[in-house]
């Protein structure tokens, strides 16, 4: 009877370890998505800064989608349209758009840090469970 309880406990610990490892994998993938989004936002920010400084009168190709672009000329580089969520677009200056981007980057960095802390916490729990599991294993006979 005691052996059954020990086996069940071992299985419970193994299930808990698998659960934590699955969560860690998911959280790491979310950190990757956040990193890609931050990279994209930083690229947009740098592009806005460049266009504000040197964009007036420049001819550019405007992407339409599916690898198709159209030639256009920048008349007022300080007039941008920005998505504020739920498909709502508003006019903004480059400075306003860049400020919005910086706020989004900061929020994403805060979320990234929280996810990394959770990964660290879950990893610590897995290590504790592995130690507990190792202590429960019978000594190997030679």
UniProtKB/Swiss-Prot annotation:
Annotated CDD domains: Prefoldin_alpha_GimC
Keywords: Chaperone, Cytoplasm
InterPro entries in alphabetical order: PFD_alpha_archaea (IPR011599), Prefoldin (IPR009053), Prefoldin_subunit_alpha (IPR004127)
GO BP term, example: protein folding
Position of the signal peptide: none
Record-level GO cellular component terms: cytoplasm; prefoldin complex
Predominant localisation class: cytoplasm
Cellular localization per UniProt: Cytoplasm
MF terms (GO), sorted A to Z: unfolded protein binding
Annotated family: Belongs to the prefoldin subunit alpha family.
Complexes and interactors: Heterohexamer of two alpha and four beta subunits.
Function: Molecular chaperone capable of stabilizing a range of proteins. Seems to fulfill an ATP-independent, HSP70-like function in archaeal de novo protein folding.
HAMAP family on file: PfdA
Name of the protein described by the UniProt record: Prefoldin subunit alpha 2
């Amino acid at each position: 009877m005691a052996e059954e309880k020990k086996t069940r406990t071992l299985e419970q610990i193994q299930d808990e370890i698998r659960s934590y490892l699955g969560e860690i994998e998911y959280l790491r993938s979310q950190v990757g998505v956040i990193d890609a989004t931050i990279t994209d936002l930083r690229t947009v920010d740098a592009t806005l800064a460049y266009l504000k400084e040197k964009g007036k009168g420049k001819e550019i190709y405007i992407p339409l989608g599916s690898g198709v672009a159209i030639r256009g000329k920048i008349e007022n580089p300080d007039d941008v349209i920005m998505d504020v969520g739920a498909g709502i677009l508003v006019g903004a200056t480059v400075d306003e758009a860049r400020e919005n981007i910086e706020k989004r980057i900061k929020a994403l960095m805060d979320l990234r840090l929280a996810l990394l802390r959770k990964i660290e916490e879950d990893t610590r729990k897995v290590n504790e469970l592995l130690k507990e599991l190792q202590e429960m294993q019978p000594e190997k006979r030679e």
